[in-house]
């Protein structure tokens, strides 16, 4: 077994309200850092150590590595508890000092180069710790890995112009085989995305770009219908708001159209009726869409009904009004097309079909009603260009917005998924953690990780004192015989099965299992919460254990029995040291309880007088005569008793309690908790059947257990997201976090985070705006007379825009270009200020190209010329005078009239339409704030309206006159009649109105886009923060667990839920085992009021063990694993896994020998500075062991085998201040020139006579 069962008095910190004890330094955080470093495959040495640690085959650790590690794991120093009360032994002249090596220093003397822990930390600057790799503890990677192949992520198709930039987070990396599929084809967008990590480049082939552009025009959806419905629910309220906004602007447009029609008589009833009906229908739909009964399924129906209304308005608006012109109705057609793309929540396919249908209707009706115009071809070509540009801009606006929304939804879902995964894993960690440590200890430790605490002279000691508890020790008598009949693996399985049963009994009897030492099991009742019936609980526990072992005896045929000893009194409980914490209890009463078990009888419960007094006569007893069987009991004159049976009164009470428990269980409506799906003594039964005796012990047949199938993680995420969508209130989020008009966050920190977001599609925005510029150029080249200025200006603008596009798109494939260009591109794209300036510059060039040719047109006033020709006043001129003019003025004549050398621009309304396109280009830049867009669009409107109304007013007046004359000529079919009713609304009146309508609609769209983006950012930020908090808690638990269990063992038990009988063990071929005990510590330990009832003695022991833990954490001892402490005995081993076992060089054996010598030196140092005379005995042995965990639900890692037993005997039979080794150990060390001497033959219990040796020193220095 793994060492002696004797438990020394030293204890655990009693932190009570009446007598709080001071806390030590922050080394427990270093302990967690070490555990996590080892978990990531990197060695760790605490920051305060300069004990000559050697580095792993690679020289010294750099200061940068030290700084990274220090900043990662040392968030701050630990807080100090309130100081000791007036009876502080340090203040009261207690006769010894309690400074460990990490804190002790000579006052004015020479420490031999050793400073205080604080000095060493300052000198080391973080210690010799090797920094872990970027990415930390790996919790995020674990969360990402949990998603596996089932996770659904949208694939980004960035308009075919740039790749998806890596965000540095696994949740944002796009993976092949996942993403958005095209609507209807059910296949994935295989080569449509270009994905790379941050800082990588990608070569975009022409075929890939074309394919990506084709994908843009196709509707996107998630492969999962359930996920797609969740996405629609996610944006339902925002879509409802967009739909309402669209209805409002459509009503406004219809009213403007009605006003224009009313301003040019004669009125047409059909036109008025259709538009009035359209307004009424839209208003009714708006009311219905904002009712509570309106839900997601109604959205599509409302959208398509609205498209039908728009198509009706389009047809009536083009067919009925007079005078007819191919340029009539372009502005509202552009408006309808663009708003369908941007404000109507429909799929891309529906939006494209609607836009094309509206364009085709306008072109067809224009061709039909204006077929006799000689200049119709130019107008139709220009109209095609305008509608094509509008559709493309609509696609370029709709697509990024939808992709952004889908990515925001998916990233939020991924955050929730990672959070739920972390939560599940954290719950598993919590269960595992709380099965090893009581809740109050574990919570205090985790709180200390977070707290920023001051550096203290002493290490933090986690200790509590409990005055009224009962301690039970139980040993299996005859276990040696049972063990001799099975292999080491079968022995571990037997222990696991038996002690799992004892753990269940302990829970039922309100006892807390403390530790398992070999075949010894001890527990305490009254911890952590006090109980008045603690003695009864321990006695009942002892009876159940004896009954359980009797059934084991029946099943196995081996004469095994339980020897139980119980004592009631006071304990100190908690953990000692910095590594591999195990909850334990210490006190003189614990020592007495241990001897009560040793002096007891098989199959009987041996109690002291103190325990008997707590039983209140509920049990019949007889004298125990423990002093006859145990020297300790005899020496201290302990009166003992043996339990005979329960009294009748106690039996009735137990029956009543059992009945109440059954009634309580039945009222809850489920079966009482059972002890898992255990298969105890499976090897002895030879099958899956559970015998009658086993059922009597409480073990259940696996077939009888109702296995609970774990929910699908994907379904759990979707269900959680659905609840969150239903619970969130967009209006509340807006009012609480976002200013109403400016749409900025109320909290400056949120605004700062939002402003730092990088929009990777900026190059696509610039490219789209440049495309608008090209369309404007083609429109004006088609409809406006050519000039040298036009050619030179457009060529200059094209070169400038091409340069801007080139620099912006470099960001998507940086490695293909020189470093200066890469730097310039990053500075533009990654800076919101720079990208906004570049966007404004691009929009300015597009706007200038829309109207600059106006200044090259004939600015003579046609009305004045006609008045002069007909000798009438200007007010008397009308369209009929144009027809009667000798100069034959017409819309198709580009020759300058009135003697002007400049050509006529007879269609100035196309300048206005070009300006409308430039406004659409403004809306493409999604990264520009809505207020910025509003200011920019108002500036464009002001400048253009000013030009129209002042220098260009004659251009528009001339066009109005010519259009009216052309319509009259067309309606009269060449006759000389001139009806006076042929009028139209002046372009100089129409232009400001339609531009204002566009500015309003584009501002509302910009506000909607930004509001959506900010709310998505806010919700994703909240989900991310919750996920990070969960991951932070998970990291705390993981570091704490790795400081309790080896990392591979912890990972095994965290992988999934384990049954109590599931066994974890591994056979190790050649392990070096060390037991190091402070031989005379029991003499030092006393419980006096002056030393806080022994707490200060335990504080010194904690300092000693902490120093040992710091030594074992050094890099040169990375092959060693601390197993546990048993009182004042320190147990360690090396070579327990492939990474620490050196079969050829035996370095793990030499490492444990060096470690043993280092402990001897450290103890001398402690004695020198604490004015004590502690004597250490160390035993070493090598050989095969079995390493494993007993109890899957309450795991305890240990090693077993003959090698462990002999190593323990080397310690117990050793000589103070010497290191005793076996012959096997001697042969390995002697071969490596270690200095040893032969002690001779030593009589070892259970082994007979053995030849042993003393280790005196390491290899001589060469």
From Swiss-Prot:
Biased composition (Basic and acidic residues): 25-37, 152-172
Domain Guanylate cyclase: 470-597, 1072-1211
Superkingdom to which the source organism belongs: Eukaryota
Extracellular side: 858-910
GO cellular component: cilium; membrane; plasma membrane
Sequence intervals crossing the membrane: 197-217, 243-263, 269-289, 300-320, 326-346, 375-395, 764-784, 790-810, 837-857, 911-931, 936-956, 985-1005
GO biological process: adenylate cyclase-activating dopamine receptor signaling pathway; adenylate cyclase-activating G protein-coupled receptor signaling pathway; adenylate cyclase-inhibiting dopamine receptor signaling pathway; cAMP biosynthetic process; cellular response to forskolin; G protein-coupled adenosine receptor signaling pathway; intracellular signal transduction; locomotory behavior
Main subcellular location of this protein, as a coarse class: membrane
Activity regulation summary: Activated by G(s) G alpha protein GNAS. Inhibited by G(i) G alpha protein GNAI1. Activity is further increased by interaction with the G-protein beta and gamma subunit complex formed by GNB1 and GNG2. Activated by forskolin. Is not activated by calmodulin. Inhibited by adenosine and ATP analogs. Inhibited by calcium ions, already at micromolar concentrations. Phosphorylation by RAF1 results in its activation.
Ribonucleoprotein keyword on record: no
Residues modified as Phosphothreonine: 1012
Positions of post-translational Phosphoserine modification: 97, 156, 667, 755
Glycan attachment positions: 239, 834, 871, 888, 973
Pfam families, per database record: AC_N, Adcy_cons_dom, Guanylate_cyc
Assembly and interaction partners: Interacts with GNAS, GNB1 and GNG2. Part of a complex containing AKAP5, ADCY6, PDE4C and PKD2. Interacts with RAF1.
Function recorded in the entry: Catalyzes the formation of the signaling molecule cAMP in response to G-protein signaling. Mediates signaling downstream of ADRB1. Regulates the increase of free cytosolic Ca(2+) in response to increased blood glucose levels and contributes to the regulation of Ca(2+)-dependent insulin secretion.
Family: Belongs to the adenylyl cyclase class-4/guanylyl cyclase family.
This protein's name: Adenylate cyclase type 5
Species lineage: Eukaryota, Metazoa, Chordata, Craniata, Vertebrata
């Amino acid at each position: 077994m793994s060492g002696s069962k004797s438990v020394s008095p030293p204890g655990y910190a009693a932190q009570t309200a009446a007598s709080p004890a001071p806390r030590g330094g922050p080394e427990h955080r270093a302990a967690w850092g070490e555990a996590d470093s080892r978990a990531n495959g990197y060695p760790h040495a605490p920051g305060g150590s300069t004990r000559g640690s050697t580095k792993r085959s690679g020289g010294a650790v750099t200061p940068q590595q030290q700084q990274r590690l220090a900043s990662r794991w040392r968030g701050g120093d630990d807080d100090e508890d309130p100081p000791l009360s007036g009876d502080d032994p340090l203040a009261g002249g207690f006769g010894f000092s309690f400074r460990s090596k990490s804190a002790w220093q000579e006052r004015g003397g020479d420490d031999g180069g050793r400073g205080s822990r604080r000095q060493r930390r300052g000198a080391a600057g973080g210690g010799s710790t090797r920094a872990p790799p970027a990415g930390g503890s790996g919790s995020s990677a674990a969360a990402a890995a949990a998603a596996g192949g089932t996770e659904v992520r949208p694939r980004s198709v960035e308009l075919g112009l740039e790749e998806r930039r890596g965000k540095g987070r696994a949740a944002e990396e796009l993976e092949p085989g996942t993403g958005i599929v095209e609507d209807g084809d059910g296949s994935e967008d295989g080569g449509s995305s270009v994905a790379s990590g941050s800082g990588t480049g990608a070569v975009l082939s022409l075929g890939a770009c074309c394919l990506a552009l084709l994908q843009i025009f196709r509707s996107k959806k998630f492969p999962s219908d359930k996920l797609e419905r969740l996405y629609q629910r996610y944006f339902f309220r925002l879509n409802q708001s967009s739909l309402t906004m669209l209805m409002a602007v459509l009503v406004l447009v219809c009213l403007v159209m009605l006003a224009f029609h009313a301003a040019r008589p004669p009125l047409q009833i059909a036109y008025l009726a259709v538009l009035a009906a359209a307004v009424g229908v839209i208003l009714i739909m708006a009311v219905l869409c904002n009712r509570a009964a309106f839900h997601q399924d109604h959205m599509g129906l409302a959208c398509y009904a609205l498209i039908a209304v728009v198509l009706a308005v389009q047809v009536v608006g083009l067919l009925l009004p007079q005078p007819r012109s191919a340029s009539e109705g372009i502005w509202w057609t552009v408006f309808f097309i663009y708003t369908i793309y941007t404000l109507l929540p429909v799929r891309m396919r529906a939006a494209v079909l609607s836009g094309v249908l509206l364009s085709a209707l306008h072109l067809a009706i224009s061709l039909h009603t204006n077929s006799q115009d000689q200049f119709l071809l130019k107008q139709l070509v220009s109209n095609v260009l305008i509608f094509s540009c509008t559709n493309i801009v609509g696609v370029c606006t709709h697509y990024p917005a939808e992709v952004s929304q889908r990515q925001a939804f998916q990233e939020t879902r991924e955050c929730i998924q990672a959070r739920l995964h972390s939560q599940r894993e954290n719950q598993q960690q919590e269960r595992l953690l709380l099965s090893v440590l009581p809740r109050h200890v574990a919570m205090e430790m985790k709180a200390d990780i977070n707290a920023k605490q001051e550096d203290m002279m002493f290490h933090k000691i986690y200790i509590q004192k409990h005055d009224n508890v009962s301690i039970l020790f139980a040993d299996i008598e005859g276990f040696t015989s049972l063990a001799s009949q099975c292999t080491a693996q079968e022995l571990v399985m037997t222990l696991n099965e038996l002690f799992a049963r004892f753990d269940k009994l302990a829970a039922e009897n309100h006892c807390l299992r403390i530790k398992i030492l070999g075949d010894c099991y001890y527990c305490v009742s009254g911890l952590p919460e006090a109980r008045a019936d603690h003695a009864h609980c321990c006695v009942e526990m002892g009876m159940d254990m004896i009954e359980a072992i009797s059934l084991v005896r029946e099943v196995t045929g081996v004469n095994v029995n339980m020897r139980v000893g119980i004592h009631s009194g006071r304990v100190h409980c908690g953990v000692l040291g910095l590594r591999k914490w195990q909850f334990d209890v210490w006190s003189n009463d614990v020592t007495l309880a241990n001897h009560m078990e040793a002096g007891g009888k098989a199959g009987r419960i041996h109690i002291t007088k103190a325990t008997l007094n707590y039983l209140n006569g509920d049990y019949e007893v007889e004298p125990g005569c423990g002093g006859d069987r145990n020297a300790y009991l005899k020496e201290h004159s302990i009166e003992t008793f043996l339990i005979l049976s329960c009294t009748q009164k106690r039996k009735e009470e137990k029956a009543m309690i059992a009945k109440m428990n059954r009634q309580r269980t039945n009222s809850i409506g489920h079966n009482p908790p059972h002890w898992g799906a255990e298969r105890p003594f499976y090897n002895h039964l030879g099958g899956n059947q559970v015998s009658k005796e086993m059922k009597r012990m409480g073990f259940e047949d696996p077939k009888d257990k109702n296995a609970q199938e774990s929910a699908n993680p994907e379904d759990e995420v979707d269900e959680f997201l659905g609840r969150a969508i239903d619970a969130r209130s967009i209006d509340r989020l807006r009012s609480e976090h976002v200013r109403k008009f400016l749409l900025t966050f109320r909290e400056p920190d949120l605004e700062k985070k939002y402003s730092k977001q990088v929009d990777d599609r900026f190059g696509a925005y610039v490219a789209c705006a440049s495309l608008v510029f090209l369309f404007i150029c083609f429109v004006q080249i088609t409809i406006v007379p050519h000039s040298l200025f036009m050619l030179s200006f457009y060529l200059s603008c094209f070169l400038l825009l091409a340069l801007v596009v080139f620099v912006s798109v470099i960001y998507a494939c940086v490695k293909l270009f020189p470093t200066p260009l890469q730097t310039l591109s990053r500075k533009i794209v990654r800076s919101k200020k720079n990208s906004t300036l570049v966007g404004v510059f691009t929009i300015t060039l597009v706007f200038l190209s829309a109207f600059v040719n106006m200044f090259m047109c004939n600015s003579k006033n046609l009305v004045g010329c006609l008045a002069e020709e007909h000798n009438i006043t200007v007010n008397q001129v009308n369209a009929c005078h144009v027809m009667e003019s000798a100069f034959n003025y017409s819309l198709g004549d580009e020759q300058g009239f009135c003697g002007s050398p400049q050509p006529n621009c007879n269609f100035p309304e196309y300048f206005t339409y070009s300006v409308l396109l430039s406004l659409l280009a403004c809306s493409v830049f999604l990264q520009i704030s809505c207020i910025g867009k509003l200011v920019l669009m108002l500036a464009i409107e002001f400048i253009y309206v000013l030009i129209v109304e002042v220098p260009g007013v004659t251009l528009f007046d001339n066009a109005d006159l010519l259009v009216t004359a052309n319509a009259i000529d067309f309606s009269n079919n060449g006759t000389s009649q001139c009806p006076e009713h042929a009028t139209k609304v002046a372009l100089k009146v129409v232009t400001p109105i339609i531009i204002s309508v566009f500015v309003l609609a584009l501002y509302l769209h910009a506000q909607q886009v930004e509001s959506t983006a900010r709310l998505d950012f806010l919700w994703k930020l909240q989900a991310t923060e919750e996920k990070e908090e969960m991951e932070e808690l998970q990291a705390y638990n993981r570091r704490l667990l790795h400081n309790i269990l080896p990392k591979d063992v912890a990972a095994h038990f965290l992988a999934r839920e384990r049954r109590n009988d599931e066994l974890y063990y591994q056979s190790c071929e050649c392990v070096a085992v060390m037991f190091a005990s402070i031989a005379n510590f029991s003499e030092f330990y006393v419980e006096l009021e002056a030393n806080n009832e022994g707490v200060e003695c335990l504080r010194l022991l904690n300092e000693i063990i902490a120093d040992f833990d710091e030594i074992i954490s050094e890099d040169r001892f990375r092959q060693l694993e601390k197993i546990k402490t048993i009182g004042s005995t320190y147990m360690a081993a090396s070579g327990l896994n492939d990474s620490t076992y050196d079969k050829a060089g035996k370095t793990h054996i030499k490492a444990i020998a060096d470690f043993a010598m280092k402990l001897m030196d450290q103890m001398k140092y402690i004695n020198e500075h604490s004015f004590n005379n502690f004597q250490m005995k160390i035993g070493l042995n090598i050989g095969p062991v079995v390493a494993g965990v007993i109890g899957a639900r309450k795991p305890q890692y240990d090693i077993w085998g003959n090698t462990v037993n002999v190593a323990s005997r080397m310690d117990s039979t050793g000589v103070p201040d010497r290191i005793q080794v076996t012959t096997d150990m001697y042969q390995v060390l002697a071969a490596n020139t270690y200095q040893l001497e032969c002690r001779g033959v030593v009589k070892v219990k259970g082994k007979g006579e053995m030849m042993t040796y003393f280790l005196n020193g390491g290899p001589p220095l060469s």
